[in-house]
Amino acid sequence: MDAWPRCLERLEAEFPPEDVHTWLKPLQAEDRGDSIVLYAPNAFIVDQVRERYLPRIRELLAYFVGNGDVALAVGSRPRAPEPAPAPVAVPSAPQAAPIVPFAGNLDSHYTFANFVEGRSNQLGLAAAIQAAQKPGDRAHNPLLLYGSTGLGKTHLMFAAGNALRQANPAAKVMYLRSEQFFSAMIRALQDKAMDQFKRQFQQIDALLIDDIQFFAGKDRTQEEFFHTFNALFDGRQQIILTCDRYPREVEGLEPRLKSRLAWGLSVAIDPPDFETRAAIVLAKARERGAEIPDDVAFLIAKKMRSNVRDLEGALNTLVARANFTGRSITVEFAQETLRDLLRAQQQAIGIPNIQKTVADYYGLQMKDLLSKRRTRSLARPRQVAMALAKELTEHSLPEIGDAFAGRDHTTVLHACRQIRTLMEADGKLREDWEKLIRKLSE
């Protein structure tokens, strides 16, 4: 609807940029005729908008459209129904497919400068910078960033696109979610406008597509993307893609498309380690103009292990409650405020889950993983599971030992040290470790 962008423009002039970016930009509007629904990605944003911005939103919408009846909901704006087919006797001229325009579809907030580098993402950062500096180079075209949700893949993609535009303001950089590519193609088929659809991709300098796992099982979509990919690759136009796992692991993707995706550079983005998580919390706090003591950042980093999005959610909750109550942010305040969130996080990754995930990964029975047998095929996975339990949970060494058939805490400590040492020289073990971390963080 037209009124919401106008309303958002006014709100941007009235509220701090960090507040608008955090609470208002994620909203999607749906006009239901007699009312307007604003959809938010989660309940926390709904609560903040209701408490802090809803009265002003109602005033502005009433001013722009004469209707201030606004509802808030969690979810995504429903897709518009497909238009009824035109009468056969009066065929309409085909229209261009509704592709996202070149300008304005990249979020300028995401840059290389505000991306927090760590061991888990440094290769991805370096690859994205190279793609922005030397677009189309065969060494990183296509560039595929893969990993679980909320680890910074889209940030790197946006940063590369923004860097391309900064170096060449005339560059036509197109960003699409995979669902948008699919929807645009369907619309083009309905409108008999596939030629226009294909021409739009031939005119761009770089194509950025998020979450290509969505293409799985959609044969026609994969066919069109395959041809689009070939045209861009042959024209040395940069392609940057993201996926929630290594593409060869995605069932339903055609072999020829998997082969194309392997032509360039594929980089895993792993869950951040403790130091990187703490640095992210401190950096995000600075962006919001909030004062966060180091020990609070360390607390959040220690407890929230899965992804960057969860770290940001915890920080937003903390800062919002501090602003509402006027209290200082201390470790005690953080523990009180985030109690339920931290408990849920702890329960999500427990020792039984780690044991089952490791057993399944190595093709073992749980009874064998926990047995006293010391054959190499059992001992190494058992050590990996113990080390993961130490890395991902708050359990003590004796508690971990008890969970592994009553083993002594010194056995657990030896396993942790052994795995850390071996990973420095054993690439396969390091790969296993990172894959298990990703599985447990999903």
Curated annotation (Swiss-Prot):
Domain I is involved in oligomerization and binding regulators, domain II is flexibile and of varying length in different bacteria, domain III forms the AAA+ region, while domain IV binds dsDNA. Residues 1-68 are annotated as: Domain I, interacts with DnaA modulators. GO terms for molecular function: ATP binding; ATP hydrolysis activity; DNA replication origin binding; lipid binding. Residues 323-442 are annotated as: Domain IV, binds dsDNA. Oligomerizes as a right-handed, spiral filament on DNA at oriC. The keyword Plastid does not apply. Residues 105-322 are annotated as: Domain III, AAA+ region. Its main location: cytoplasm. This is Chromosomal replication initiator protein DnaA. It holds the Pfam family Bac_DnaA. The gene is dnaA. It comes from Xanthomonas axonopodis pv. citri (strain 306). GO terms for biological process: DNA replication initiation; regulation of DNA replication. Residues 68-104 are annotated as: Domain II. It comes from the Bacteria. Keywords: ATP-binding, Cytoplasm, DNA replication, DNA-binding, Lipid-binding, Nucleotide-binding. Belongs to the DnaA family. ATP binds at G150, G152, K153, T154. It is found in: Cytoplasm. One of its GO terms (cellular component) is plasma membrane. Plays an essential role in the initiation and regulation of chromosomal replication. ATP-DnaA binds to the origin of replication (oriC) to initiate formation of the DNA replication initiation complex once per cell cycle. Binds the DnaA box (a 9 base pair repeat at the origin) and separates the double-stranded (ds)DNA. Forms a right-handed helical filament on oriC DNA; dsDNA binds to the exterior of the filament while single-stranded (ss)DNA is stabiized in the filament's interior.
